[in-house]
Amino acid sequence: MCALRRLLAKAADFIRESDKILLIICIFTSLYGCAAVFSATHYRATYRPFLIQFICFAAGVVAALIISAVDYSKILRYWYLAAALGVIPVMLTFFIGFAPEGTDDKAWLDLGFTTFQPAELLKICFVLTFSAHLSAVKPNINKLKYLIPVCMHGAFPVLLIHFQGDDGTALVFAVMVVFMLWAAGVSKKYFLAMIPVILIAAPILYFFIMNDDQRDRLTAIFGVLNFGAKRDPNEQWPTYQQWRGRTALANGGFAGQGFLNGDFTQNGIVPYGFNDFIFVSIGEEFGFLGCMAVILLLGGICFRCLQVARLSKKDSGKLICVGIFAMIFAQAVINIGMCTSVLPVIGITLPFFSAGGTSLFCLYMGIGLVLNVYLHRNSRTIYLHDNLK
């Protein structure tokens, strides 16, 4: 009887001390995302993408709760295991990588019953390893003998994913590195020193590293390819997706055409309307109001991550929250920028909305880490009732 009382007391404390606000926002966001995936794939007469999304959502919530229960300080002690867990699957893609239909990047592993994108897991593992590294050297972070290894650590996943062929995800890693370095207290002078380096590297990147398709997509944003010119609807060109996307968004108007009623969405006219361009599908069927709901929900998640970072008493906890914030923020901004023709198309999914089981499950792993930081935000260990009679 005492054991049962102790277990119930621990469960009650766990519920009371958990960040219910963040978890509830994430659940509502995922339900909205599942509905959007269902609608965007309805014309294909298959429920597989929706079922995968919903199953990974449910499994992700469970994983987040489990991860949140183990003190993150203990998890960080095994940073080397996190590094291996993140890097080894990515390395395997160089040898047995699988490229799904519609992409040339062999950035997936075929597990037989489903596919798995290791870069998504690497994001979470990198947040752990980089947080452990930064918190360990934080008092001396601005000394070059400590800063250089830190920068090499940050550059590793960026370069690894670049050579894998997924430059969009590499860019997300770069944003995560910058935000986490800033949060760790790296001096502004180092960030300012990077400006001339970026200015010098930009033309080299454009002329010698980018391929023709990437250059066309970038220059099209600035009107070099005459974005608004009349084109053959059946012809594929660098901004074809965005042209279709803008047309579908305009078709949605203020309140949208209604669930399962989008002319473009329900006829599969917008390429990848269930994945990279799901924001467009939402805009057509739910209109400006639906798009604003997406932005507010994702903004709420990002804001809550930063709030938890501020509440944490440990540097490692703050850095974990900032890393997860940066991951979600970067993906959301880039994806919405792609869909609205503000940024070039680089294959970034919209967090919690785009179809993709690996992405959604790993997102919840990241949310689990933020919940963990909130749960263990004080120095005392919670939900211990050893003195219960």
Which residue ranges define each predicted feature?
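Membrane-helix boundary/helix-loop-helix interface segments in multi-pass membrane proteins
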Residues: 2-24, 28-29, 35-165, 326, ...
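Transmembrane alpha-helix boundary/anchor motif
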Residues: 62, 70, 129, 209, ...
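Hydrophobic alpha-helical segments of polytopic membrane proteins
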Residues: 62, 80-87, 145-161, 167-207
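Membrane interface segments of multi-pass transport proteins and intramembrane proteases
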Residues: 69-80, 96, 111-113, 139-143, ...
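Juxtamembrane membrane-interface segments at transmembrane alpha-helix termini
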Residues: 89-101, 182-190, 202-212, 229, ...
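Hydrophobic, glycine- and aromatic-enriched re-entrant/interface helices and adjoining loop segments
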Residues: 102-108, 193-291, 315-316
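Interfacial segments of multi-pass membrane proteins
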Residues: 134, 171, 176-190, 263-290, ...
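Hydrophobic transmembrane alpha-helices and their immediate junctions
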Residues: 289-332
